[in-house]
Amino acid sequence: MASGKEIKTQISSIGNTQKITSAMEMVAASKMKKAQERMEASRPYADTIRKVIGHVARGNLEYRHPFMEERQVKRVGYIIVSTDRGLCGGLNGNEFKKVVKHANEWKEQDVEADFAAIGSKGTSFFKRFGKLKAQVSGMGDKPELKEITGSIQVMLDAFEEGKIDRLYVVFNKFVNTMTQEPTIHQLLPLPQAGSEEDVQTGSWDYLYEPNPESILDTLIRRFVEMQVYQGVVDNFASEQAARMIAMKAATDNAEDIIDQLQLRYNKARQAAITQEISEIVSGAEAV
């Protein structure tokens, strides 16, 4: 049985760790709130671009953009959004499992896959597959669109050149503090028109300069970039929520361990006192 001094040292060590996990929990909660605000702020922009794409496409039915063309799928591409740091529970692991399962389903149809990774965890994981075409990491707490456009462009070029026939973005969708869902969203090919709701929102009659085709090309590229960026912001909010929960669990577990160690310390102290009393009594009887 450990001595009282050793147990006291353990209690002190775990107490220090508990202070760290508690601080990390509070920091994650603060970052999550800010990430939610960025997430909500970016959505209207992407939604508006989607509606404009639908209207421009419907106004030029004779032109079909290559990014809207369905074709036989021989190879697929994934842009995988992950975290740069750990200590966020099974957030990355669950996402990677979903990607691997999805890619294996395509492989059963003789369709291979290429990957682009956003985040160091995704980079290190998918490097093992040997098909990592682009990667970016180290974006910090305020990811910006310009930091990910290079990796996105690599996959857009691959689609345009016919090297891949379908493109997905994968991220952890922030549902609420307790729930983050690994999500696979198809980026390309895009549907030609918007939703029925968009169709019924009124008639748009615009003149396009220089021409609808170049505007549509720019809009679609920007839309894809915004969809991926939305995934990055969603994933960051999910990361902070998962880390907050993980750190809270660690803090609670540390409290439980401290309670158990305190009980052991009290028992050890009681045993030592009893031993001392026994020795005093034995000594008195000997006299």
Swiss-Prot record:
InterPro entries: ATP_synth_F1_ATPase_gsu, ATP_synth_F1_gsu, ATP_synth_F1_gsu_CS
GO molecular function: ATP binding; proton-transporting ATP synthase activity, rotational mechanism
Cysteines joined through disulfide linkages: none
GO biological process: proton motive force-driven plasma membrane ATP synthesis
Keyword Cell inner membrane set for record: yes
Coiled coil: none
Pfam assignment, any one: ATP-synt
Name of this protein: ATP synthase gamma chain
